[in-house]
A protein has these predicted regions:
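Residues within membrane-spanning alpha-helices of integral membrane proteins
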Residues: 61, 114-118, 122, 188, ...
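Small-residue-rich hydrophobic segments that form or flank transmembrane alpha-helices
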Residues: 14-86, 151-156, 164-223, 227-231
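Residues that define the loop-to-transmembrane-helix transition and helix capping
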Residues: 54, 82, 108-111, 181, ...
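Interfacial loop-to-transmembrane junctions
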Residues: 228-250
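Hydrophobic alpha-helical transmembrane segments in multi-pass integral membrane proteins
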Residues: 155-163, 198, 253-263
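Glycine/small-residue-rich loop that forms an oxyanion/phosphate-binding "nest" at active or ligand-binding sites
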Residues: 81-125
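Membrane-interface helix termini and inter-helical loops of multi-pass transporters
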Residues: 9-11, 99-109, 133-135, 202-214, ...
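Transmembrane helix exit motif
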Residues: 68-78, 115-139, 231-232, 252-263
Length: 263
């Protein structure tokens, strides 16, 4: 459980930290709005020295609830509710289990395993793209839907424990050959739903004191203009460029997880 060691839990940030935080959250919003990944990792890196490592995951639950909510709003036309609901059926129990075990579980093991799996998915996806004789749309992506159940549960569990683990479901959705906007919209809907569950659970576990809630809400709101800018920019980028951004963020996130696990 989170036990603040200072009055109100955290020192009041000065104006420099506040301005830096706004800039970081804006850029993180742009990155996530273009690729579906990276927002949590960037903000987590900024917050850790301010609120403490153990408070990062509870804070991110609120931040990403707000951030993903804005992605749903801006990319709503690409949302597939059937896929979202199907994944949430198993992801939600996994998220609840992860939240309850968060304070005691060895995170490094999951970071390493997740990083390796994500890199493997990306390599297979890239190989299939290079070896396909026709357009990407001819890959017959329905062959991988059998993995939806296991991926959903594992994602829900790890998402509560490891910052940046949302890239797992991003890699899965990307491998189904969805459009870029559909990947971002469906990933955001799944993540927002799970983050709502995590917020409620962390509050019950006393891991989200009021001062931390205020900091997290401020960070989440600061990221919304970045998502809007990403939506505007995405309509002006070529599809190949957007796919490249997504693949690049998936690879960087996986490498980052491996570095944290074994570095």
């Amino acid at each position: 459980m989170f036990h603040p060691s200072r009055p109100m839990g955290f020192p009041m940030p000065d104006i420099t930290i506040l301005l830096s935080g706004i800039a970081v959250c804006f850029l993180a919003g742009v990155l996530g709005g273009l690729s579906g990944a990276g927002t949590g990792l960037v903000i987590a890196g900024f917050l850790a020295p301010i609120v403490g490592a153990k408070a990062v995951m509870p804070a991110l639950a609120i931040i990403m609830l707000i951030n993903n909510g804005s992605r749903i709003f801006y990319f709503f036309q690409s949302l597939n509710l059937k896929i979202v609901l199907a994944m949430l059926v198993l992801a939600t129990p996994g998220s609840m289990l992860g939240a309850k075990l968060y304070v005691d579980i060895p995170v490094s093991f999951f970071e390493g395993a997740l990083g390796l799996v994500i890199l493997l998915v990306l390599i297979i996806k890239t190989w299939r793209r290079m070896s396909a004789s026709g357009p990407v749309a001819h890959w017959k992506p329905q062959k991988i839907w059998w993995a939806l159940g296991p991926v959903s549960f594992v994602y829900g569990f790890i998402n509560t424990i490891v910052p940046g683990s949302g890239v797992m479901v991003l890699a899965f959705l990307s491998a189904t050959c969805m459009t870029t906007s559909a990947v971002i919209a469906n990933d955001a809907a799944i993540a927002a739903s799970l983050n709502l569950v995590k917020v409620l659970l962390f509050r019950q576990l006393d891991a989200l004191p009021d001062p931390l809630v205020l900091i997290a809400v401020a960070c989440g709101i600061a990221s919304i203009p970045g998502v809007w800018f990403a939506k505007w920019l995405s309509t002006r980028l070529k599809t190949k460029v957007q796919h490249g951004i997504i693949d690049g963020m998936i690879a960087l996130s996986a490498i980052h997880l491996l570095f944290r696990a074994f570095g």
